[in-house]
Amino acid sequence: MPIDPVALTADLVRCPSVTPEEGGALDLIERILSGAGFDCTRVDRNGVPNLFARWGRKGANRTFGFNGHTDVVPVGDAAAWTRDPFGGEIADGWLWGRGATDMKSGVAAFVAAAVDFVQETPPDGAVVLTITGDEEGDAADGTVALLDWMAAEGEAMSVCLVGEPTCPERLGEMMKIGRRGSMTAFFTARGVQGHSAYPHRAKNPVAALARLIDRLSSHDLDRGTEHFDASTLAVTTFDTGNPATNVIPALCRATVNIRFNDAHSGASLTRWLEEEAARVTAETGVEIALSAKISGESFLTPPGELSELVARAVEAETGLRPEPSTSGGTSDARFVRAHCPVVEFGLVGKTMHQVDERVEVGQIEPLKAIYLRILKDYFA
């Protein structure tokens, strides 16, 4: 009997899988896949739950992979929700709950499509699912752990589809063929504390750091590249921790986040930030230290066989030709891209991470149909 992706989405939403808790979501998926003949392995690392499942022969020449996650962000104030965030309630044409959009519906749709596919038309090849419980957190022991385990065990994917929400307004209008890189820069300015009436006796870290931040935020990183929009820099914090209005503090901190395209790398941007900080230090005498965290480099799966496969299936099922895009935030595709070509396609993501997160019920079955067509066309 075909799996109902709507019912499965509701069941997954009822699993309270807030990172790093598994909440029963991976257990549910494992039971379904095992019952359909998939070889399932739990690849848990440092207490983080992950699931690897394969139908077909290990090392098959053609192995279609899927990547997704069942962990969700916290609900925030549960009293602010119209409905139980872990109720999986269907009302007014919507399925409500945390993770309904991001991305339990996408996981449910592919699980349903994969089970139907291997049972109805067993392919000459293999189908692999990599499902993590650590995408919304640090992501150090999620998809990365799965890929590390696969490499050690001789498991592979020829191509991979990530089921994250990709469509801004309508199902079918956008797929992701790459993502911008992301880095966060933490600045600490150390000056000399003093009385605000005698600024010449102090070294003001606030003024120095403000000068640096102004230069960074007014600098055009680039004008965009062939497949990417212009890189962006956003100031996200500026703190002194100083409650006194007549004291120049000794310390000031600021944070900026950069989303960068393929004109840059994390290393090149770090060098630029260090150079700018050194210039301001030389001008003001205030030491400015930098600590940079690079969450992921930019990447691109050039338009070609995989993106065309996805685009044809989407257009056949929705009538829309998806725009190949690299916009938005990061995803676990940034890890998969080192393993095999990867494209992302999923539902409309307007309510993800919000209070009253919900997915339009009428999108879930068509998403399953798209995924099923992708599988059939890939193995045709």
Curated annotation (Swiss-Prot):
Q: Which is one GO molecular function term here?
A: cobalt ion binding
Q: Which reactions are catalysed by this chain?
A: N-succinyl-(2S,6S)-2,6-diaminopimelate + H2O = (2S,6S)-2,6-diaminopimelate + succinate
Please provide an example of a Pfam family that matches this protein in its UniProt record.
Answer: Peptidase_M20
CDD domains per the UniProt record, alphabetical? M20_DapE_proteobac
Metal-binding in keyword set: yes
Disulphide bridges in this chain? Answer: none
Q: Which cofactor does it need?
A: Zn(2+); Co(2+)
Residues engaged in binding Zn(2+) 1 = H69, D102, E164
SUPFAM superfamilies given in the database record:
Bacterial exopeptidase dimerisation domain, Zn-dependent exopeptidases
Instruction: Classify the source by domain of life.
Output: Bacteria
Q: Which InterPro entries match?
A: ArgE/DapE_CS (IPR001261), Bact_exopeptidase_dim_dom (IPR036264), DapE_proteobac (IPR005941), Peptidase_M20 (IPR002933), Peptidase_M20_dimer (IPR011650), Peptidase_M20A (IPR050072)
Query: Coiled-coil segments, which residues?
Result: none
Q: In which pathway does it act?
A: Amino-acid biosynthesis; L-lysine biosynthesis via DAP pathway; LL-2,6-diaminopimelate from (S)-tetrahydrodipicolinate (succinylase route): step 3/3
Entry's EC annotation = 3.5.1.18
* UniProt KW keywords: Amino-acid biosynthesis, Cobalt, Diaminopimelate biosynthesis, Hydrolase, Lysine biosynthesis, Metal-binding, Zinc
Q: Which GO terms describe its biological process?
A: diaminopimelate biosynthetic process; L-arginine biosynthetic process; lysine biosynthetic process via diaminopimelate
Q: Which residues form the active site?
A: D71, E135 (proton acceptor)
Q: Indicate which residues the UniProt annotation says bind Zn(2+) 2.
A: D102, E136, H353
Q: Does the keyword rRNA-binding apply?
A: no
Cofactor, free-text remark? Binds 2 Zn(2+) or Co(2+) ions per subunit.
Quaternary structure note: Homodimer.
Outline what the protein does.
Catalyzes the hydrolysis of N-succinyl-L,L-diaminopimelic acid (SDAP), forming succinate and LL-2,6-diaminopimelate (DAP), an intermediate involved in the bacterial biosynthesis of lysine and meso-diaminopimelic acid, an essential component of bacterial cell walls.
Q: Which family does it belong to?
A: Belongs to the peptidase M20A family. DapE subfamily.
Designated name of the protein:
Succinyl-diaminopimelate desuccinylase
User: What organism is this sequence from?
Assistant: Cereibacter sphaeroides (strain KD131 / KCTC 12085) (Rhodobacter sphaeroides)
Q: Which gene encodes it?
A: dapE
